[in-house]
Amino acid sequence: MAKRRSWFGWMKRLFICEAKARAEKKPRRLRWVFKRLKLRPQLATCGQETRTLNEATQDQRKHAMNVAIATAAAAEAAVAAAKAAAEVVRMAGNAFTSQHFVKKLAPNVAAIKIQSAFRASLARKALRALKALVRLQAIVRGRAVRRKVSALLKSSHSNKASTSNIIQRQTERKHWSNTKSEIKEELQVSNHSLCNSKVKCNGWDSSALTKEDIKAIWLRKQEGVIKRDRMLKYSRSQRERRSPHMLVESLYAKDMGMRSCRLEHWGESKSAKSINSFLIPSEMLVPTKVKLRSLQRQDSGDGQDSPFSFPRRSFSRLEQSILEDESWFQRSNGFQPYMSVTESAREKMRSLSTPRQRVGIMDSLFDNYKKDGDKVSLWSTFVCENSKINNAKKSSLTTYQHNC
């Protein structure tokens, strides 16, 4: 059976238990503090140990790497030494073999040099022979050409005419070349003068001309140069067409020994004045435009009253232009201003004239010229015949007017 406990016992127990509990709690706290203090140095020691281990592993790795690098360098050095030794051995062997090869090729090289020198000498000889052959061919061909030319000159019947033709062509070429050069010089001078005039117009100029007047003068000069060039081209074409006839006429005139140039020019001027007084207005040979207009008015006035049938004006204009071109051509070229008659000129005048005009003018003129020869000049016979015809026409016109 259990013993009964009093309240006093219970109180003791409580107090005693609390005291025990407090006594027990104090060492537990102390233990916990001591444990913490113990754990801290343990943790520090663990960290130090881990650090030392890592450093040791790193040192080991570095050492291993250094050892590997050293071994690799040693291996490379060994390989390089082996290669160098192999090259030395090879060079030594090549030197030995090259010495043997040079000793073997020395006579071959000497033979090649001898062959090249011999071939060069042969090539030089061949070139000299070819040059000599070319010279011989040139000499032979030149002699053959000279023989042909001499044979042609001997066989030609008109040797003098051919030489005169050649001389005339050369002189004409020189003349035309001079004219072209002169035209170029004139153009250059005109351009230079225009530039100078422009410069002067910008500044002070003592002349009374204005800028417009200077430009107008320059334009007129250029137009004159262009017209001159055209006329020269036209005369050249006409001369090329009529050159054989003119050359024959000039040679014939030289052989016949006609009068001087001044007398012929004076005779031409006199005959032209006399022709203008009695020829038909459609066949007038007047070079000026004023006389042509007056004659055309007379033609239009007389055509209604006169009984004669005049030809068309187209023929007169064509004939007049041709004769003007011929007169200008004779003046522009280096020929003498005389008029020599040929069959071609006679046929031309007949083709251009009408049947009524063919009867008494040109045929009688040419016949008289053939009969007289050197004694009577062409212009004198022409003037005499034309004066007779003019008198006859005037008398017929007066009789017709009286009858009307």
UniProtKB/Swiss-Prot annotation:
The keyword Transport does not apply. Gene3D superfamilies: 1.20.5.190. Its main location: nucleus. GO terms for cellular component: nucleus; plasma membrane. Residues 108-135, 136-158 form the IQ domain. Keywords: Calmodulin-binding, Cell membrane, Membrane, Nucleus, Repeat. GO terms for molecular function: calmodulin binding. It comes from the Eukaryota. A motif (Nuclear localization signal 1) lies at residues 11-18. It is found in: Nucleus; Cell membrane. Disulfide bonds: none annotated. The keyword Disulfide bond does not apply. A motif (Nuclear localization signal 2) lies at residues 226-233. InterPro entries: DUF4005, IQ_motif_EF-hand-BS. It holds the Pfam family IQ. Residues 8-25 are annotated as: Calmodulin-binding. Belongs to the IQD family. May be involved in cooperative interactions with calmodulins or calmodulin-like proteins. Recruits calmodulin proteins to microtubules, thus being a potential scaffold in cellular signaling and trafficking. May associate with nucleic acids and regulate gene expression at the transcriptional or post-transcriptional level. Binds to multiple calmodulin (CaM) in the presence of Ca(2+) and CaM-like proteins. This is Protein IQ-DOMAIN 12. It comes from Arabidopsis thaliana. The gene is IQD12.
